[in-house]
From Swiss-Prot:
Disulfide bonds: 31-84, 41-66, 49-76, 64-78
PANTHER family associated with the record: DEFENSIN-LIKE PROTEIN 241-RELATED (PTHR34450:SF6), DEFENSIN-LIKE PROTEIN 245-RELATED (PTHR34450)
Signal sequence region: 1-23
Cellular compartment(s): Secreted
Listed name of the protein: Putative defensin-like protein 253
Family of this protein: Belongs to the DEFL family.
Amino acid sequence: MRFASLFVVYCTFMFLDISHVKCEVEPVPYCKVITWYDVKCGADGNKTCVDHLIKGHIYDVPVCDCSELTTSGILCTCQHRFPCKEPPPLHRISIRKQIRG
């Protein structure tokens, strides 16, 4: 009986000790991506930007903000969760060419 009582007391203290431990959890950083496309935002600009990014197999599921440019095209400012991935080199070159000329 004595060992059973000690075991119950031990388990109770272990439960209290474990339940009061505070963990420091670091927030997962967002990755910011800004891309330009020669289309219109339309009724749902967020969906337009997400569709273009997924179509190019660049990012998994970004959250985007679509801004119409005064000249032509749209500017998609997107954020998605870790891990941050750079666009493929060919995509960056095509974006730069579109912006410059």
